[in-house]
């Protein structure tokens, strides 16, 4: 089993995530390879794509949005990401039925979450795009509380009913899944696919973010050990295992490259995928510097890598 230095781990993570020589051919390819681009702030998600796709323009991105080649839904860690539409099912498969705070929150307000979701879907089916204000009117007096931090939109997204229309600086409109695909919900859910959502997530993670530890995957996915460990242990047999300077096992789907050159400095935007994907924060920055990157209230600053 080959050992890796901290520098080799860092350089190969930069390489595999599309920041060095191995860049992606399109925004859709980058979004798919990384299994989503965190985008609660749309402009920072776009910077993550500009850094990984040569010659990408704002016009290219807008075409991808207009053609619905890229959509926004809630995914890992219950945060908004840009995904390709084909990956929506995998997000649903992993997260839709996980216990989360949404149902309890609705109950605490005296509202039935399932009933709310039915009403929201009825509104979505009547219009191509529905504004946040229209949903607020539908939800009534409790609208603000039901929509806080994404609220009921999160479950609607995880259920495969609604997606956010990508727009800067933040989401204003939502659309139904039938704007992308006319497939009925029951067929969309039951159609056979070559991999489960969890298998797909694990494979993409160790391809784009390896070398990484099991704890890193847990951090990135936001899942509990019992949600993933059995499947992960089976898939790890197909990956390459390395030993880091800290004595931990690091896994990668691809063989690591030696003598990776960074070349020119890299300016990564806030919430770049590299900075939300690892449990150990000092893999690239010193302990002193990490507090300047990871701020309070979950904020992650832009970073210049020299």
Q: Which positions does each model-derived feature cover?
A:
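PLD/PLD-like phosphodiesterase catalytic module centered on the HKD motif
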Residues: 283
């Amino acid at each position: 089993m080959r050992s890796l230095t901290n520098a080799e781990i860092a350089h190969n993570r930069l390489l595999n995530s599309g920041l060095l020589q191995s860049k992606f051919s399109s925004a859709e390819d980058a979004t798919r390879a990384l299994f989503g681009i965190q985008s609660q702030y749309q402009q920072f998600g776009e910077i993550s794509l500009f850094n990984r796709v040569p010659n990408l323009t704002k016009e290219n991105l807008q075409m991808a949005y207009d053609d619905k080649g890229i959509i926004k839904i809630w995914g890992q860690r219950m945060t908004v990401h840009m995904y390709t539409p084909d990956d929506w099912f995998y997000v649903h498969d992993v997260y839709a039925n996980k216990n989360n705070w949404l149902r309890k929150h609705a109950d605490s307000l005296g509202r039935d979450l399932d009933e709310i979701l039915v009403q929201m879907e009825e509104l979505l089916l009547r219009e191509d795009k529905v504004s946040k204000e229209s949903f607020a009117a539908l939800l009534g007096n409790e609208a603000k509380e039901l929509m806080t931090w994404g609220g009921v939109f999160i479950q609607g997204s995880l259920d495969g009913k609604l997606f956010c229309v990508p727009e800067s600086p933040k989401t204003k409109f939502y659309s139904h899944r039938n704007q992308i695909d006319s497939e009925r919900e029951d067929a969309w859910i039951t159609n056979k696919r070559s991999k489960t959502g969890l298998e797909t997530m694990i494979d993409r993670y160790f391809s784009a973010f390896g070398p990484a530890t099991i704890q890193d995957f847990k951090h990135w996915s936001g899942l509990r050990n019992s949600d993933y460990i059995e499947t992960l242990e089976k898939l790890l047999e197909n990956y390459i295992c390395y030993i880091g300077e800290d004595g931990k096992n690091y896994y990668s789907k691809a063989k690591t490259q030696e003598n990776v050159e960074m070349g020119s400095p890299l300016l990564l935007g806030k919430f770049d995928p590299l900075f939300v994907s690892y449990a150990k924060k000092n893999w690239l920055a010193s302990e002193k510097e990490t507090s300047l990157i990871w701020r309070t209230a979950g904020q992650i600053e832009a970073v210049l890598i020299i």
